[in-house]
Amino acid sequence: MVHDGNLYAAGILRTETGENYNKGVDGVTPLIAGVTTPEQTQRLLAHLTSQQELFTPVGISTVDQSAGYYYDNGYWNGSVWLPYQYFLWKSMLDLGYGEFAEKIAKTALHAWSQETDFSYNTFELIQIESERGGWFHQFSGLSSPLVVWYHSYYKPGNVTVGFDTWLEEWHFSNDYSSARIRYKTSRVGGLLLAVMNEEYSDYSVTIDGEPAQFVQRIPGTLEIRLSQWQGEVIVQAK
């Protein structure tokens, strides 16, 4: 952003050739803040999901790959950082984009596993060009999002929501074939992930006694759409 002499916003900061200097992951952070209009949400998602722009085989790039100032082997520019993947993943749950949320998580888990299987190190970042880890090799703080993703999709008894939903309580049966979850949310239409027993292929889900919309993209992991501001979710194997 360029400011005038009175420090008021005067326009977009651009390169010498006129290109927007904010064509990077920072430019989609309004999605994380939850302040976008429906039209803005769709425009930002188009940049975020495009494989020619921000989405790469190892995750969401820090800088748009189509930008004139993109560099494919930098420390920040040209790399994937897991904390940003985490923030945007949580935001996708808020927005109700479960398929893309899962893609973010699975891509990060694969990229990390690929490097760790090879080197047994947890690096600061994943470089897009080489798909290898880079810089400090014992950066354990960045492993926390990976643990969260794994638990959110594969650990029975786990419940996950976005930033805008509060879990009041949750209880699972001993064999994870049923669950009772109470929540409050400031965003109707967001998602709740509940990891159940994958040995049961069919489940019923209600919110305050009414049938709820849900899908299973991963066996046993239910992606439940929250249709009201607060309620009690009941999950039961059939």
Give the ranges of each region predicted by the language model:
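C-terminal beta-strand-rich structural cap/linker in extracellular carbohydrate-active enzymes
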Residues: 191, 216-238
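Generic long, charged, amphipathic alpha-helical segments
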Residues: 56-82
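Short, isolated positions in well-ordered beta-strands
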Residues: 168, 212-213
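Short strand-turn-strand beta-turns centered on an Asx-Gly dipeptide
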Residues: 206-210
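Short linear motifs in exposed loops
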Residues: 12, 215-216
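Gly/Pro-rich turn-and-neighbor structural signature
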Residues: 1-6
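C-terminal capping/lid segments that line or modulate ligand- or cofactor-binding pockets
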Residues: 7-51, 74-178, 185
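Surface-exposed beta-strand/loop patches in extracellular or lumenal glycoproteins
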Residues: 184-201
